[in-house]
Every structure is written in C-alpha cells, then in structure tokens.
From Swiss-Prot:
Known function: Catalyzes the attachment of isoleucine to tRNA(Ile). As IleRS can inadvertently accommodate and process structurally similar amino acids such as valine, to avoid such errors it has two additional distinct tRNA(Ile)-dependent editing activities. One activity is designated as 'pretransfer' editing and involves the hydrolysis of activated Val-AMP. The other activity is designated 'posttransfer' editing and involves deacylation of mischarged Val-tRNA(Ile).
Gene for this chain: ileS
Protein name: Isoleucine--tRNA ligase
Molecular functions (GO terms): aminoacyl-tRNA deacylase activity; ATP binding; isoleucine-tRNA ligase activity; tRNA binding; zinc ion binding
Cellular component terms per the entry's GO annotation: cytosol
Record text on cofactor binding: Binds 1 zinc ion per subunit.
Residue span of motif 'HIGH' region: 57-67
Residue sites binding Zn(2+) per the record: 887, 890, 907, 910
Keyword list, A-Z: Aminoacyl-tRNA synthetase, ATP-binding, Cytoplasm, Ligase, Metal-binding, Nucleotide-binding, Protein biosynthesis, Zinc
Family statement drawn from the similarity comment of this UniProt entry: Belongs to the class-I aminoacyl-tRNA synthetase family. IleS type 1 subfamily.
Reported cofactor(s): Zn(2+)
Residue positions of motif 'KMSKS' region: 594-598
Organism: Thermotoga petrophila (strain ATCC BAA-488 / DSM 13995 / JCM 10881 / RKU-1)
Length: 919
C-alpha cells in the first residue's frame, strides 16, 4: 500500500531557484511603490534617533567596488539599527566640485575650453557632475541600499554652498584664515595647489647627488650636502645643520669637507671616497651664520642655519635649504632665520627668468643640465639615482613639487584649534580602536591647511583686491553679502557678476579707504565642501541633530573627510561632528594586489549584480573581515552562490514544513514542548544573543559565520534532520508535530530578522511567504529585532545536550562504518547499542532514553555493559541491522508490524496516527 498521501510533506510556493537578477528588480519596484524609505521611518515615529551620516562619494564616474562596499556597509548598519527600534534616517550625499571633474570636462571639451569663460566651464562641470549623480543613484539603489534618494545633499546646490561659505565665514571671523607666500604642494600638470589629503605616495626614481659648497672665507673648506631634487638648487639660500650633532672635518686631498660623523661610513661606501683622515670634530652650532658660495650662482651666498629636524638616516647631516620649495626649509630658513623665499618656477613647472640660464626648462628636464653644470664647476661629489616614496597628484597621478605661491591658509593653531580637535578626538569612539592614534598623529603633525585652488570648478573664495593699493581682503561682511546672492543664484554669480554687485554698498578697502576692486578667482579646497556637510545636514534636516551618531568610510579618510570634518566642526560648533567613527579597509584582488585597469583585475560591482544578483555581493561583503583589506575576484564572489543556496534551502525547508501552521492557534507553550524542541529553542536564544553582540560591534563577518554554521551544521544536519520524522509522519495537529513547528517557526522568524540587514532581497521574499499573522508591516525592514529570552534556556538541558551531541558524533561515525560495509543503507536500518564509559553517562542516557532513537535517526537504541566496537570519549558504540520489518510509512524497523486490512505493513506508531488515535 502507498502511504505517501498520508504524510505531511513540505509545501511552499517559495521557489528553490532564487533567480536573483530578475527577482531583485521586482522588489526594487515594490519598494519604490510603497515609498519604502518614508514608510519605514513612519513606523519608527517617536523612537530614538540613530543617524549615520553619509560621506559623499565623488560624482565623476560609475560606482566601483570600493564605493559599493561602503554603501552596503552603511545599509547594513542602518537596517540593523532600524530593527533595533531606532529611527534611522539615511540621506545620501555627493561631492561634486573640484579638479577631477574639471579635468574630465576639459578632456571632453579639448581645445574648445580655451575659448570658454569660467562661467561656461562651470556650467559644463555642473552638467557632468549631476549626470553622474543620477547614474550613481540608480546603481546604489540597485544594490538594495535604502535611503532618501529623492532628497540627497549635493555640494554644488546653492543651499549647500551657502553652508560651506557660512562655515568658512566663521573661520575668517575667528582669525584662522590668512594669506601668505608659502611653499605648498603644487601639481604642474593640473596647475593648482594641492592639500595634504590630495596627495598620494608612489615609488619614483629621482637623481641622488652629493654637492660640496665652498666657504667664502676659506677656498679649501666645504660643506657636503645630499639632495634628490637638483632642480631646487637654483633656489638655494642656506645649509641646515643639526645644532647638537657631531660633524667631522675630513681631509680629502687638499680640501676639508664637513660631514656628520655618524654618516661617514655610509658616505664613503656609497661614493668610494676615503674619509678616514678626520682632522677635527665640531658641533653643528659651531658653523651657524657662516657663509658659503652658492652652487649655481657665484654672486650669491648660502648661509648656515641650525635645524633640529636634520636627521642621521641618510645623506650627510647637512641639508640644502630652499624656503621656496620645502615646508621645513620655509619654517627654519624663512620664519626663523629670515632667509629669502626664492621660487623661480611657474605654474606649469618651468623655470622663470629668476633661474637664469635654465629659464623655460621643465624642472625635471633641468635636473640633468644642473648636474652637468655642477660637474663642470668641480663641486659635484657623486651622482646616482634612487627609487623612493614620493608625493603624487591624486588626480593626474604625476609627481608634485613644493612651490612658493600666494595662497589662503587655515591656521590650525590659532585659537588653540589643533588642541581642541585633539581633545575632541579622544571623546569619539573609534572602530577599530587604532583609528584614534592614526588621526591623532595626523592632526599633531599636520601643517597649516592650504585651502585655495587655482581652478574654476569650486566654491569661490570671496576675496577682493584693491585696484588702488593692491591690498587683498577677505572680509566676513563680503562673505555674508555673497551668501545672500548664492542662496538665490548659486556660486556661479561670482564668475558672472561685476565685482560691485558682489560686495556690500558701503564696503571700502580697509587699507586705503578706496572702493575700486577686482575679484580674486581662487576656489576652496573640496575637502572644505565635504567637510562642511555636518553643518548642512544638521541645520536642514530635523532628524539629523548635532553631533551625528556615526561616520563610516575607508581608513584613508582619517586624513580626508574625518579630518576636515572635525576641524571645521570644532571651529564652527566647538565639538566633533560625530560620536562614533567606523572604518573599513580597501579592496584588493585575489593575490592581494591593488585593483587597476592595467593589471586587468578590476571587479565591476554592476557586472557582479547583473551576473549573480546584488544579494551575492552583499553576502560576499558580510563574509569579509572588512576592518582589514578585503580580497575579491569573480571566483571569490561565485563561491558565495553555494553558501547562498544552503541558506535559501534552509528557509525553503522551514517554510515548507510550516505550511498550514497558524502562529497563534497552533503554537505549543514552552512547558509542553518536547525535549529536543526545547533544546533547539534554547540554542536559538544563544544564536540571537551572539548575533546581536556581533551586530552591535559591527562584526558582520562573525554574524555571517555564525549563521552559515547554524544553518548547515545545527539545522540542516541536526535539528531539521532529526524532526523530519515527526513533521512528516505524526498527525498534522499532534503535539509531536506542533511542538517541532512551534520551534521551527521561532527559528524562521529570528533567522529571517538576523539576516534581513545583510540579505535584504531574500529576506523580503521570505517575509512575503510568511503566514499573514506574522506580517505586521509591508516590509521585513520595518520589523523589530528578535528578542533574546533567557527563560527559553534550560541550562541543565543545554549541558546535557552537549554530551548527547558528542555521543551522537560517535554514533554517526559508527553508522558510516557499517554503511561502508553494506550492513545498513539508511540510518533507520540500524539498531545502536551504547556502552556508557561511567555511571554519570549511563544516568544521562537513561534520563534521555525516550529521545535517543529520534536524536540518532535510528530504529532502536539499547544500552549494554558489554564492550562496543567504536571507542568514543563517553561511550562505546556497536551498530547492527535492526530486527523486524521496515514500516512502509516511516521506514523504521519494528518487530510489531501491522497486519490490519486497512493499514497493513506499518509500525504501531503509524497505525495509531492513521487511525486518528495519536494526538
């Protein structure tokens, strides 16, 4: 007789195949229709706020795997906090000014750009930026990221530009902004100043030369310097020695050379010059003020100064000083000693007339010519080359130079700003903790902030220059007047209007009292644009109070957005703009290499999405320890499809076996649950507790590992396998089946919620297949986090089960051995004989005697004192084929097979079920 129709086999419309690529688009449409973002916020009305403030990506291209990683991480945090009961708004932003966009636009325009006005170029830049805002918006939405996509903040919008100027005005009012001729990073290809945050370090091959400077007093007395920038020698005005280092005066032929004693051996080894004849030892301070002949221009001199930054790591301990081309040179040479600033290099990196015969040469091309001239003069001691880490432009990737120009700066020490920032850093929670020391050291060491750029695409610095006396003025009254214009017309007005319209009617030159001005055309560093986002978001959005709860970006932002934001916020508001800062690493390829088009190892997130679905990308991210650098390749991503399949199958099994289960009417109270079910419910509480702890510490890879292990080893291979018999065989409404279903229902709901922040599409699909009584909201994203219930953990039961599951492992090994020997096929063919190792284990097995067959999925379990075949830690195990006949309904063996006419060939349990006698 075929009993198949008498079994409670799983039934569900939840498909086995995910078809993610198409299914995700369906959910995106549904979320759009329900206005998901506002709907979820509405469900948390009146709840405490948690605000993750979005660091704006740059709108100059499609999203890449790094920006995808960042947005998904933020989405996981926001969705988790929402489920924990917070009102968690998320307003995306875009950074839209600056050189990279202007660079791309100039490439597109080609020669035409030379005929265009600044206002026309700016219009093209705006169109370009907004085009990519729209492109990136759709790409981020495709990743399943929930946000206020219709109302983002965009740094080029007039209402945002006003806030940039407002923050800037505060700095001007407080006296932190000044103008000065100083050496700053300069990109000769992009023809603009650069800030520290716009610098990248790459290996670069440079000349390495030793040059001797002749004393003006004694033609045979020389100081030997070492430099890797021969092109800066025309700008030389001094030589720096350390005041306290010991220097040796070495006899070389008829000449005496000064070299730091500790560097003599290294110098000799590199140059091949014998330095053993030391005639005198002196301190650096002994030579202070002495004058030496300029290495390039014989009519100029070079003065010895003292500087404690001089090191004994490389070179000679004697440093050539050019205040026009170096930060320390400027501080020690110009500020402390009053040496002149010579900077004979124009904006394109070519020498000016001041450089004499080198005029018109590009600086790097001039290196060889200068070295040859030094050789002819007989003062080149040694020349070679060196590969070292050197600053490069973030945009064009070319090497930069230090060049002295008139620029605007923010003084980081005026009004004790640096110290206040350091104090605020210590009040912030940094995750990982090392972020605190990283940003602290950067703030402690940073120079004043060069904030002016010689480009048109940016927020203009509203400074004016008096035509009568040449005074350049940056006045809060002018900034405020301009802000009112910007509110209505945007910052393009600065480039379109006459200067008289841009300044207050009563404004005159503070130096000469005249009212005849011209506009200055410098623009602000874009790090001020993005750094002022706290001011915009907290004044424009009621649901974004200051300070904001969290900033979450890559670890490079310790010197970027985290850095600029805290300086501007402390200046404007007196405190850090964030309470918590979370950083992630960078994405590398499978071999740990940086992604680059030249290596052909770039993984396009949208390609992954179109091939596998956004869910797989989200799952890959959750599997990664993102605090460190993360590896990715299409192969690595593909591995997640198998993990995804296992998780999906777990949900399908749960849904299939809960078909017809009414969570209100069919639930079994805890005290009536069967033993195995009570254990499983206790384990679920432990899973909920650990998952919550991991989410709270943002350790999503631990959530992933916990859930994957739970689904595969505890559910599929253990609990769900064990209860299949009860689910399929017992009466539909019996306590045996309902007890298992009650716990499976708890598992389904909790697991769905735990995975919802990560697997946002699939858990929405699971939610749509729940019993209507389980769907309180239109979306799983509005649900509350599963509650950890201590009362569901029976400590004694949990401890007992640790031992029982250890015994089960031994039983499974013994079963497998007999399967290999063809003694049994399915485990239900077996009878297991257990020999406990001691009385404690014997008592344990006696205590749980009634559930052992179910737990081991065998037909019979008996205890014995005889020796067993497999020696385990707690028991010895013998497996033999079960006696009797196989029940045609449940496949268990019994010696009491039914001969009933109505239900022949079944065991007593199945007979009772079929007769309706087993409840």
């Amino acid at each position: 007789m075929d009993y198949k129709n008498t079994l409670n086999l799983p039934k569900t419309s939840f498909p086995m195949k995910a078809n993610l690529v198409n299914k995700e688009k369906v959910f995106l449409e549904e979320w759009e229709k329900m206005d998901l973002y506002n709907y979820v916020l509405e469900q948390r009305k009146g709840k405490p706020l948690f605000v993750l403030h979005d660091g704006p990506p740059y709108a100059n291209g499609h999203i890449h795997i790094g920006t995808a990683l960042n947005k998904i991480l933020k989405d996981i945090v926001v969705k988790y906090k929402t489920m924990r009961g917070y009102r968690a708004p998320y307003v995306p932003g875009w950074d839209t000014h600056g050189l990279p966009i202007e660079h791309r636009v100039s490439q597109e325009l080609g020669e035409k750009i030379k005929e265009m006005s600044p206002a026309e170029i700016r219009k093209k830049c705006e169109e370009f930026a907004l085009r990519f805002v729209d492109i990136q918006r759709e790409e981020f939405k495709r990743l399943g990221v929930r946000g206020d996509w219709e109302n983002p903040y965009i740094t080029l919008k007039p209402d945002y530009e006003v806030k940039i100027l407002d923050v800037f005005k505060t700095l001007v009012e407080e006296g932190n902004v000044y103008r000065s001729l100083k050496p700053i990073y300069w990109c000769p290809r992009c023809r603009t100043a650069l800030a520290e945050a716009e610098i990248e370090y790459h290996d670069h091959k440079s000349p390495s030369i030793y040059v001797k400077f002749r004393s003006k007093e004694d033609p045979n007395f020389f100081i030997v310097i070492w430099t890797t920038t021969p092109w800066t020698l025309p700008a030389n005005v001094g030589i720096a020695l350390h005041p306290d280092y010991e220097y040796s005066v070495v006899k070389v032929g008829e000449e005496k050379w000064v070299i730091a004693t500790d560097l003599l051996d290294a110098f000799s080894k590199e140059t091949g010059i014998d330095c053993s004849n030391v005639v005198e030892k002196i301190k650096g301070k002994d030579l202070e003020g002495k004058e030496f002949v300029h290495p390039i221009f014989d009519d100029k001199t070079s003065r010895v100064i003292l500087a404690d930054y001089v090191s004994l790591e490389t070179g000679t301990g004697c440093v050539h000083i050019a205040p026009g081309h170096g930060e320390e040179d400027y501080i020690y040479g110009h500020v402390q000693y009053g040496l002149p600033i010579v900077s004979p290099v124009d904006e394109e990196g070519r020498f000016t007339e001041e450089a004499g015969k080198y005029k018109g040469m590009f600086i790097e091309d001039a290196n060889e010519v200068i070295i040859e001239d030094l050789k002819k003069k007989g003062i080149l001691v040694h020349a070679s080359s060196i590969t070292h880490s050197y600053p490069h432009c973030w945009r064009c990737k070319g090497p930069v130079i230090f060049r002295a120009t008139e620029q605007w700066f923010i003084s980081v020490d005026h009004n004790n700003l640096r110290q206040k920032v350091l104090e605020e850093i210590d009040k912030v929670k940094w995750i990982p903790e090392w972020g605190r020391n990283r940003i602290r050291s950067m703030v402690e060491e940073r120079p004043d902030w060069c904030i002016s750029r010689q480009r048109v695409w940016g927020t203009p610095i509203p400074a004016v220059k008096c035509k009568e006396c040449g005074e350049v003025t940056l006045d809060p009254k002018v900034i405020e007047h301009f802000m009112k214009i910007v509110e209505k017309e945007g910052t393009n007005a600065w480039f379109e209007k006459e200067v008289e319209e841009l300044i207050p009617e009563d404004f005159v030159c503070p130096k000469c009292g005249k009212r005849s001005f011209e506009k200055m055309l410098d623009t602000l560093d874009v790090w001020i644009d993005s750094g002022a986002s706290f001011e915009y978001i907290t004044t424009k959005r009621e649901d974004h109070p200051f300070p904001l709860d969290m900033y979450l970006e890559g670890s490079d932002q310790h010197r970027g957005w985290f850095h600029s934001s805290i300086f501007l916020a402390v200046a404007k508001r007196g405190s850090a703009p964030y309470k918590e800062v979370l950083t992630h690493g960078f994405i590398k390829d499978e071999q740990g290499r940086k992604m680059s088009k030249s290596l052909g190892n770039v993984v396009d997130p949208m390609e992954v999405v179109e091939k596998y679905g956004a869910e797989i990308l989200r799952l890959w991210l959750a599997s990664s320890d993102y605090f460190n650098d993360i590896k990715i390749s299409m192969r690595i991503v593909e591995q997640q499809t198998e993990v995804y399949r296992k998780i999906r199958n777990t949900f399908r099994f749960l849904l299939g076996n809960l078909e017809g289960f009414d969570p209100e009417l069919d639930r079994v109270p805890y005290e009536k649950l069967l033993t195995i079910d009570r254990w499983a419910l206790g384990r679920l509480q432990e899973i909920i507790k650990r998952a919550t702890e991991y989410y709270d510490s943002y350790e999503f890879s631990k959530v992933y590992n916990l859930v994957v292990k739970y689904c595969t080893t505890e559910l599929s291979s253990l609990y769900l396998d064990v209860v299949k018999d009860r689910l399929y065989v017992e009466a539909k409404d019996s306590i045996y089946r309902r007890s298992a279903q009650t716990v499976m229902h708890e598992i389904l709901i909790a697991l769905m919620k735990i995975l919802a922040p990560i697997m946002t599409f699939t858990m929405e699909e699971v939610y749509s297949h729940l019993h209507e009584k389980d769907r309180k909201y239109k979306t799983v994203q509005a649900e509350y986090w599963p509650e950890y219930k201590e009362e569901f953990i029976d400590r004694e039961l949990m401890e007992d089960f640790e031992k029982l599951l250890s015994i089960r492992e031994d039983v499974l090994k013994a079963l497998e051995e007999k399967r290999q020997q063809d003694v049994i096929g399915h485990s239900l063919d077996a009878e297991v004989v257990l020999v406990p190792k001691n009385d404690t284990i014997k008592a344990l097995l006696e205590k749980y005697r009634d559930i052992l067959e179910e737990l081991f999925i065998v037909s019979k379990v008996s205890l014995s004192d005889a020796s067993g075949e497999l020696k385990g830690e707690l028991v010895e195990v013998t497996v033999k084929h079960a006696e009797g006949e196989k029940c045609q309904r449940c496949w268990k063996y019994t010696t009491e097979i039914s001969t009933s006419e109505d239900f022949p060939g079944v065991c007593p349990r199945c007979l009772a079920v079929l007769k309706g006698e087993r409840k």
